[in-house]
């Protein structure tokens, strides 16, 4: 995007957040938040603990039914015994979670706790206004670890009228690590068989490589182009090609705050044309809109897709998601030998942009139907999960069995694979309710991921810091609540798929789309949001 001001990624990386709790490495800082809230919740907490009766807490997070299926799982038992809760799954998957949660919010069937990427969407404000979700207690002094966590800028920025309605799930140390949230893995072995001798350095070279693989079809499997591991990932490859950071608000050339998506019409045309060309040429698979996790993984594993867009907190996540299965099929060490991660490629202006979202992707929410007793139990749960003891249990396992403490540091035992050993950790995210495992970005954090895979994450992040361009963005505006802003809905993924797969000229479709948004009140919404930003003293940097 040509109009937004930019700051070097290297400078931002130096500002890595120091408030992340150290989990397996040491003790977290504690502090109190003192306000004028009543003590009903803390009283309920004391009463429940005195009675020693576990409080049933229903929870919806990806794969919860599997993660909570063994009541005797040592990690799960440790959490429940330490907090006085009994976790009950209300299952969602990566394919259906948002639809299910929005439906439950409408029909009153929300679980006590649910997770998702909702804070920047219009219905977050609606949930607050309609009383769908409950705010955390004003006084969190009884829960010092939770209180410390809620000082996070993202949590405070998303508050309403002094109330905190969501708990950020910490992902990374700073925003530059969000490059790990959109990655492309491709079959370098097949590219070489197709006559490619150099790994691609540009978008054009990448597309030429995929087309060469498809044309040669070296393994005779009628291989197709690039798929995505989950719905809505493909934009993370497309939009940076035009400098668009579609999750953020920026300042346009007129000094007006706008979603990056709407900041420059020509940039949007460029991005959509790039997507259309890839789709037409077969670089992007024809059934990309139907992509589902297990299907996409299997197609890539079987050599039926030449490339795949994925998240998984970076390439290190490939080991558990597909690398081990690949090695089982094709021989030990074959995945790292046969596959490569796409580098950052330059846009038309020469800058190498990348997907930018947040250092805390997704949030945990509490249903308004939760009473004081349950709220106290939920606060105890999160307070424990943010404690040193809780993080060690969730991410390091059982002391003496899975890890030892040597000179004050946790050292994982050789051969330990928590995801294979514990049902609580296998193929689900229930263990990441409070935060994502720091092992994906913090190289000093104890981990059972192979060093070779962790190094892939380090290399990708280094590419972003040294070579990437991070436009200046304004989360203070992103989280503003105004009537028109809360009601205005746009979906960059749906727009992308519609135009990419469309038959009319891209430029016409983009103009028609923008006209449609204008008819829905885009300009009025922007004027209202900018007026509110001015009232709050938010200025263009």
List where the protein language model places each region.
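Bacterial Sec-dependent N-terminal signal peptides
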Residues: 1-11
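Extracytoplasmic/secretory soluble proteins
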Residues: 11-12, 20-541
């Amino acid at each position: 995007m040509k109009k937004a001001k930019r700051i070097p990624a290297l400078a931002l990386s130096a500002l890595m957040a120091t408030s992340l709790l150290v989990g397996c490495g040491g003790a977290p800082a504690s502090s109190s938040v003192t306000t004028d809230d009543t003590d009903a919740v803390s009283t309920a907490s004391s009463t429940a603990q005195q009675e020693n009766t576990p409080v049933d807490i229903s929870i919806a997070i990806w794969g919860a039914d599997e993660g909570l299926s063994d009541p005797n799982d040592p990690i799960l038992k440790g959490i429940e015994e330490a907090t006085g809760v009994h976790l009950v799954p209300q299952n969602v998957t990566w394919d259906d979670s948002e639809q299910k949660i929005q439906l439950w919010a409408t029909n009153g069937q929300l679980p006590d706790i649910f997770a998702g990427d909702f804070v920047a969407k219009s219905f977050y404000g609606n949930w607050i206004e309609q009383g769908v979700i409950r705010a955390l207690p004003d006084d969190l002094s009884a829960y010092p670890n939770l209180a410390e966590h809620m000082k996070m800028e993202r949590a405070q920025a998303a508050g309403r009228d002094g109330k905190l309605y969501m708990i950020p799930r910490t992902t990374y140390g700073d925003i530059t690590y969000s490059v790990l949230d959109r990655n492309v893995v491709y079959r370098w072995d097949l590219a070489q068989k197709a006559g490619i001798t150099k790994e691609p350095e540009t978008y054009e070279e990448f597309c030429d490589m995929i087309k060469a693989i498809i044309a040669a079809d070296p393994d005779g499997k009628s291989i197709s182009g690039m798929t995505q591991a989950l719905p809505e990932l493909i934009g993370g490859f497309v939009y940076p090609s035009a400098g668009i950071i579609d999750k953020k608000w920026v300042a346009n050339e007129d000094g007006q705050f706008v979603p990056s998506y709407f900041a420059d019409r020509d940039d949007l045309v460029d991005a959509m044309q790039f997507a259309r060309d890839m789709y037409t040429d077969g670089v992007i698979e024809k059934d990309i809109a139907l992509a589902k996790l297990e299907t996409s993984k299997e197609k890539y594993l079987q050599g039926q897709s030449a490339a795949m867009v994925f998240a998984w907190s970076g390439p290190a996540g490939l080991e558990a998601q597909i690398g081990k299965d690949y090695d089982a099929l094709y021989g030990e060490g074959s995945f790292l030998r046969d596959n490569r991660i796409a580098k950052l490629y330059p846009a038309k202006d020469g800058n190498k942009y990348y997907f930018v979202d947040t250092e805390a992707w997704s949030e945990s929410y509490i249903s308004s139907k939760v009473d004081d007793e349950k709220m106290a139990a939920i606060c105890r749960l999160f307070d424990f999960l943010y404690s040193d003891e809780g993080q060690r249990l969730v991410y390091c396992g059982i002391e003496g069995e899975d890890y030892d403490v040597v000179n004050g540091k946790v050292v994982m035992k050789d051969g330990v694979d928590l995801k294979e050993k514990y049902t609580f950790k296998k193929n689900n995210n229930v263990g990441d309710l409070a935060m994502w495992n720091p092992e994906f970005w913090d190289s000093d954090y104890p981990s059972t991921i192979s060093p070779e895979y962790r190094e892939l994450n380090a290399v990708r992040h280094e590419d972003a810091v040294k070579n990437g361009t991070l436009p200046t963005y304004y989360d203070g505006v992103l989280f503003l609540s105004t009537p028109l802003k809360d009601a205005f809905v746009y979906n960059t993924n749906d727009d992308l798929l519609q135009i990419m797969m469309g038959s009319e000229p891209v430029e016409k479709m983009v103009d028609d789309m923008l006209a449609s948004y204008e008819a829905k009140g885009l300009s009025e919404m922007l004027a209202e949001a900018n007026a509110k930003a001015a009232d709050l003293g938010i200025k263009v940097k």
